[in-house]
Amino acid sequence: MTRILLLLLGFYQYFISPLLGNNCRFHPTCSEYAKEAISMHGSIKGLWFTFKRIIKCQPFCNGGYDTVPISIKNSKPLNKKI
């Protein structure tokens, strides 16, 4: 499922997005955010993060720099005990 979603996003970015122009209020763009979220968290959780991001991408939001939340279980510890 993850691979299919990433292929669909790639299709959108290559063929559809150039026709629509740059309308995203955020960096990275919503489609790039979706690719990162799905790659990092899998299809279900990645789609949930993408849905929340697209809801925020509207005229009443200032936009800006917004990254995909990092999963605590996937992150590496900052320091090691010796």
Swiss-Prot record:
Q: Fetch the Pfam families from UniProt.
A: YidD
Query: Could you tell me which InterPro entries the record lists for this protein?
Result: Membr_insert_effic_factor_YidD
Q: How does it sit in the membrane?
A: Peripheral membrane protein
Going by the UniProt record, its keywords in alphabetical order are:
Cell inner membrane, Cell membrane, Membrane
* GO CC annotation terms, alphabetical: plasma membrane
Locations listed in the record: Cell inner membrane
Highest taxon of source = Bacteria
PANTHER family given in the database record: MEMBRANE PROTEIN INSERTION EFFICIENCY FACTOR-RELATED (PTHR33383:SF1)
The job of this chain, per UniProt, is described as: Could be involved in insertion of integral membrane proteins into the membrane.
Q: Name the HAMAP family on file.
A: UPF0161_YidD
Family of this protein: Belongs to the UPF0161 family.
The identity of this protein, by name, is Putative membrane protein insertion efficiency factor
Q: Which organism is it from?
A: Rickettsia africae (strain ESF-5)
